[in-house]
Regions:
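Cleavable N-terminal export/targeting peptides
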Residues: 1-12, 177-178
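Extracytoplasmic loops and strand-loop junctions of Gram-negative outer membrane beta-barrel proteins
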Residues: 15-18, 53, 99-104, 152-158
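Transmembrane beta-barrel architecture of outer-membrane proteins
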Residues: 16-18, 28-30, 64-68, 112-116, ...
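Gram-negative (and chloroplast) outer-membrane scaffold detector with strong preference
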Residues: 37-133, 174-175
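Internal, hydrophobic beta-strand segments that form the core of beta-sheet-rich folds
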Residues: 133-139
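A short acidic/glycine-rich loop-to-helix N-cap element
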Residues: 144-146, 153-162
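Outer-membrane beta-barrel "beta-signal"
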Residues: 163-178
Length: 178
């Protein structure tokens, strides 16, 4: 199937599919990829995924996997300029021994889920390449089991947290498949 045509005034055809990666995830050694496809000339569906499988010395870890589908409404036309999005998020995690969010002497294992609203902008930098910046705010709920941080650490109980705040931030490099 041929790529859809863009409205008058744009130089690039609407892509069938875009593949992207978030540079901010790579800064934390987290593998990630995203896929975006059009549903209408100004609407798209994005599926982002991330994964961090690493355990560091002394059993320190910030392991996770996540999936984050999002529906976007582009102000001008798809894959160029400003957009608003609504997303869901589901993730699993196993993290501890890191000086972040009170995990220096604890390990947390569980899942989180939530939803948010995103704003972003995409700049074309070539016929098929573009750079996207995005940020989102929303709600997350985390259900977890807590342990003393060390290998086979003592079980400390279950817990949950509700969170309102940033749910997504990204600077992504996008490649269009026409």
């Amino acid at each position: 199937a041929a790529a859809q045509e863009r409205p008058t005034g744009s130089r690039r055809p609407l892509p069938l599919l875009e593949v992207k990666t978030n540079a901010l995830y790579w800064a934390t050694a987290s593998l990630n990829a995203g896929f975006e496809t059009g549903l209408a000339p100004d609407i798209s569906l994005v599926i982002d995924a991330g994964y961090n499988p690493w355990t560091f010395g002394d059993n320190r870890k910030f392991k996770f996997w996540l999936i984050q589908p999002e529906i976007r409404r582009w102000f001008r036309c798809r894959s160029e300029g400003h957009f608003l999005g609504v997303h869901l998020l589901y993730a699993g995690f196993n993290a501890g021994g890191v000086k972040f969010l009170g995990m220096a002497d604890r390990r947390y294992e569980g899942s989180l889920y939530g939803a948010g609203v995103a704003y972003g902008y995409r700049w074309p930098v070539g016929k098929r390449w573009s750079v996207e910046a995005t940020a989102a705010l929303g709600y997350l709920r985390s259900d977890y089991e807590r342990y003393v941080w060390k290998r086979c650490g003592r079980y400390l109980g279950r817990g949950h947290k509700n969170y309102f705040g940033p749910t997504k931030i990204g600077v992504s490099f996008c490649f269009a498949i026409e």
